[in-house]
Amino acid sequence: MSGAVFGEQMLGRDAFYALLAREGLKLKRPKPRHTTNSNHRFHKWKNLVKGYVPYGPNLLWVSDITYIQLASGNCCYLHLVTDAYSRKVIGWCLSHTLEAKYTIEALRMAIKQAEGADLSRLIHHSDRGVQYCCNAYVEELHNIGASISMTEDYKPTDNGIAERINGIIKTEKLYRQPLYGSFEEASIGIDEFIRFYNDRRPHMSIGFQTPSEVHRQCGPQQRQWQGYQQTSSP
């Protein structure tokens, strides 16, 4: 049928790719960017949040790191801490590298926004990356009395809320615009989007309220992500 429409000289897919390769026109496949290095000597903590649904803010924080491509071909890294109850981004840091000091900076922002609240019932959940397992990060969590929880394998659903926030930032902001021209431009743009996300963007999983609205509440919300099925008791 395609021959009848486009003519007998139409190339098939494989022949077309071979022609591109022969003429040097194929683009190089970009190297994958990895933000998680779980091959390290530090202790890896058990997953404490299977079936757990927080009933208020500052009971479950989820953390993750994602990368942002720049127009120069380089990238920068966005370290995020999100409250799982309200879906509010409560801590973030944009950095040139994956050093743990930037992950700690995002955590300290989250602690500061809690404004002295009792965090002794807080669970901090993340992947098993070295940034979250290193002594300095663990010490920050121990200092506030938080429990530490980590994913047990590499399934994105094990840190689903954090992965969802990454996806929202990329699909609703980064993929709809040209690449940022500089680190400084990226920092301004991310700051603006996080403010918009927290204060103005209704969220399906919290009854079309904004994260900032829900962060001032407690009690069950209308919808929850799959994987957090059981409400915690006060």
Model regions and ranges:
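Active-site beta-loop-alpha junctions of metal-dependent nucleic acid enzymes
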Residues: 74, 92-117, 133
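C-terminal domain-tail junction helix/linker
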Residues: 142-146, 168-234
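Short helix-terminating capping/connector loops at secondary-structure junctions
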Residues: 9, 117-120
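Mobile genetic element proteins and their domesticated derivatives, centered on retroelements
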Residues: 16, 20, 49, 64, ...
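An active-site-proximal beta-strand-loop segment
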Residues: 54-90, 96
